[in-house]
Amino acid sequence: MVNTRRDCYDLFRRMPEGTLHLSALMCGEHRSRVIARIKEHLAAKEPLRVVSTQVVEAGVDIDFPVVFRALAGLDSIVQAAGRCNREGRLNAAGRLGDVQVFVPPKPAPRGMLLKAKDTTRALMATGDLDPEDPQKLRRYFKHFYSRLNDTGRTFMEML
């Protein structure tokens, strides 16, 4: 999962044949067909590669054994992790799902995406970031919302 539709499309074009593309740029009917194909592959336990935007983070019932997620806000990373071993099928084999967070080659666009990513990165630097701990999630949101109105300039510089 990547942060922007452009990144999704660019990455998809670099992937091997057979990779599926899923983003909000697609019309609803096309997205539904791709989601159906994904579910067919997963049900048949066939290898599958999907390049997606956050469109699958919420409201899409898909269960992947492995998820790669571009660095983003902690809330987005947690949502992406919710697509991994969602149904607990790997538990019978004594395995958990595998969620890998990577730093994309292009920076996040300015605005909320960048502030969310920067907040996650700042908390990661403290070594005190646990997405399963509700206290840590509260800490993330406190830091994130405190950054929303921060323009990076002082009041005197804006005069």
Feature annotation, model-predicted:
Residues 3-6, 54:
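Alpha-helix/helix-capping structural signal
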Residues 60-64:
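Conserved ATPase-coupling elements of RecA-like P-loop NTPase cores
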